[in-house]
């Protein structure tokens, strides 16, 4: 009896291991999204090879999406949307989507450089804990909303909470290795200089959404640019 139970246990363990390997291989090889907007120069680095991105191009697990003087819009199969602005780099570190399993779904994105806008899809609705958005200096916890991230050449990050397509606003957490802040209001912003620095106190941008796009996108990110923006263009929300 004990021998039979041991054999059944070993068989179950083997089946689980095989399933995980197959799922990993499937995620790596399968299309997880598509380019829905493409203007100017854009490319994708995949398995060490770089190729041009065009409208309807497939997006896959571990892709590094890069833009020059152009921009790319991507819709993932769970309806997550990202907009990669000019002179930017977005890395898809992990993506698994099972519409019937909150635990089995996961999304990890890394903004390495430039400006990227994010709008939550079904993975965040299934389990917001399974969405992990990162920059070199910050980690953003998503709670069903939209926001933008701008990263300069040395990793300093500016994160801005935005209204979603319906006009409502959720919230996000922004954390470094030593501190965390919560953004809850439209156009609220925080900046993170390094992983060892506390995110700045949230402030309200005195800007419209289109102004944010123009100010943060028209030129390649420059060192300290985002700090000048914070000093000169951000003010506390009027009461």
Regions found by a protein language model. Give the residues of each.
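Tight coil/turn sites that cap or link beta-strands
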Residues: 79, 86-89, 136-137, 144, ...
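N-terminal post-signal-peptidase region of extra-cytosolic proteins
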Residues: 46-61, 66-71
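Short acidic/polar mixed-charge low-complexity motifs
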Residues: 49, 78-80, 138, 179-180
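Short, small-residue-rich packing micro-motifs
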Residues: 65-72, 84-133, 163, 168-172
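Short beta-strand segments in beta-sandwich/barrel cores
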Residues: 41-43, 72-74, 89-90, 116, ...
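C-terminal interaction modules
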Residues: 1-29, 51-54, 68, 97, ...
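Well-ordered beta-strand positions in beta-sheet-rich domains
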Residues: 52, 56, 81-83, 89, ...
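Short N-terminal segments immediately surrounding and downstream of signal-peptide cleavage
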Residues: 30-48
